């Protein structure tokens, strides 16, 4: 790594990815269900992808544990010109 790349500001995507990796590592050590954050992240991304086009590395999920309660925080960076997907038409059964 050169001095120039060290001084260059990092993008939010790489910072978010690094934070998520730290959270995942922490969860694996602390929790009996190491896949909880991974599962939640994938399910949340799949639901969001049905409605809006968003880059996967722009989603940050944080799980904080307190006394008797856990808090799940989700930060999603939407571009200004986000593409909203139209709702799919569903066929209803005629009764």
Curated annotation (Swiss-Prot):
Coiled coil: none annotated. Keywords: Cell cycle, Cell division. InterPro entries: MinE (IPR005527), MinE_sf (IPR036707). GO terms for biological process: cell division; regulation of division septum assembly. The keyword Cell cycle applies. It holds the Pfam family MinE. HAMAP family: MinE. Belongs to the MinE family. Prevents the cell division inhibition by proteins MinC and MinD at internal division sites while permitting inhibition at polar sites. This ensures cell division at the proper site by restricting the formation of a division septum at the midpoint of the long axis of the cell. This is Cell division topological specificity factor.
